[in-house]
Amino acid sequence: MNISKQEQRVLHTLAMGGEIRRYLNEDGKLTEITCFTREGYGLSNCTMDTFKKLKNKKLISSKGGRPYRITPLGATSAQAQMNQR
Protein backbone atom coordinates (compact mmCIF):
# COMPACT_ATOMS: atom_id res chain seq x y z
CA MET A 1 0.00 0.00 0.00
CA ASN A 2 1.38 3.41 -0.94
CA ILE A 3 1.65 5.70 2.06
CA SER A 4 3.11 9.21 1.81
CA LYS A 5 5.72 10.53 4.24
CA GLN A 6 3.16 12.77 5.90
CA GLU A 7 0.78 9.84 6.37
CA GLN A 8 3.64 7.73 7.78
CA ARG A 9 4.45 10.44 10.35
CA VAL A 10 0.84 10.57 11.51
CA LEU A 11 0.58 6.75 11.63
CA HIS A 12 3.79 6.53 13.65
CA THR A 13 2.48 9.08 16.14
CA LEU A 14 -0.74 7.08 16.48
CA ALA A 15 1.21 3.83 16.85
CA MET A 16 3.13 5.34 19.75
CA GLY A 17 -0.13 6.09 21.61
CA GLY A 18 -1.42 9.25 19.95
CA GLU A 19 -4.96 10.05 18.88
CA ILE A 20 -6.86 12.21 16.40
CA ARG A 21 -9.72 14.27 17.79
CA ARG A 22 -12.40 15.59 15.48
CA TYR A 23 -14.55 18.67 15.94
CA LEU A 24 -18.02 18.97 14.42
CA ASN A 25 -20.20 22.02 13.83
CA GLU A 26 -23.85 22.22 14.89
CA ASP A 27 -24.91 20.52 11.64
CA GLY A 28 -22.76 17.50 12.46
CA LYS A 29 -20.21 18.17 9.71
CA LEU A 30 -16.51 17.74 10.30
CA THR A 31 -14.85 21.16 10.64
CA GLU A 32 -11.47 20.53 12.24
CA ILE A 33 -9.17 17.71 13.32
CA THR A 34 -6.21 17.75 15.68
CA CYS A 35 -3.65 14.99 16.13
CA PHE A 36 -2.17 14.64 19.61
CA THR A 37 0.90 12.70 20.69
CA ARG A 38 0.73 10.50 23.79
CA GLU A 39 2.31 13.37 25.76
CA GLY A 40 -0.52 15.72 24.70
CA TYR A 41 1.36 17.82 22.15
CA GLY A 42 -0.35 18.77 18.88
CA LEU A 43 1.01 17.46 15.58
CA SER A 44 1.02 20.25 12.99
CA ASN A 45 1.39 18.12 9.84
CA CYS A 46 -1.90 16.24 10.37
CA THR A 47 -4.23 17.96 7.90
CA MET A 48 -7.82 17.28 6.92
CA ASP A 49 -6.59 15.80 3.63
CA THR A 50 -4.22 13.39 5.42
CA PHE A 51 -7.01 12.41 7.82
CA LYS A 52 -9.39 11.60 4.96
CA LYS A 53 -6.75 9.53 3.14
CA LEU A 54 -5.96 7.48 6.26
CA LYS A 55 -9.65 6.97 6.98
CA ASN A 56 -10.42 5.89 3.39
CA LYS A 57 -7.53 3.39 3.50
CA LYS A 58 -8.97 2.08 6.82
CA LEU A 59 -5.68 2.70 8.62
CA ILE A 60 -7.46 4.63 11.42
CA SER A 61 -10.87 4.17 13.01
CA SER A 62 -13.09 5.50 15.76
CA LYS A 63 -15.38 3.39 17.91
CA GLY A 64 -18.31 4.76 19.87
CA GLY A 65 -17.54 8.43 19.26
CA ARG A 66 -14.07 8.16 20.79
CA PRO A 67 -10.97 9.74 19.19
CA TYR A 68 -9.49 8.08 16.11
CA ARG A 69 -6.79 5.49 16.77
CA ILE A 70 -4.62 3.32 14.56
CA THR A 71 -6.09 0.01 13.34
CA PRO A 72 -4.19 -3.29 13.16
CA LEU A 73 -3.86 -2.75 9.40
CA GLY A 74 -2.42 0.71 10.07
CA ALA A 75 0.04 -0.69 12.59
CA THR A 76 1.40 -3.18 10.07
CA SER A 77 1.54 -0.48 7.37
CA ALA A 78 3.53 1.98 9.51
CA GLN A 79 7.26 1.70 8.89
CA ALA A 80 9.72 1.89 11.76
CA GLN A 81 11.50 5.18 12.32
CA MET A 82 15.15 5.35 13.30
CA ASN A 83 14.62 7.89 16.12
CA GLN A 84 12.58 5.40 18.19
CA ARG A 85 15.36 3.07 19.31
Swiss-Prot record:
InterPro entries referenced in this protein's UniProt entry, alphabetically: YjhX_toxin (IPR018654)
Coiled coil: none
Listed Pfam families: YjhX_toxin
Family per record: Belongs to the UPF0386 family.
HAMAP family: UPF0386 (MF_00827)
Official protein name in the record: UPF0386 protein VF_0869
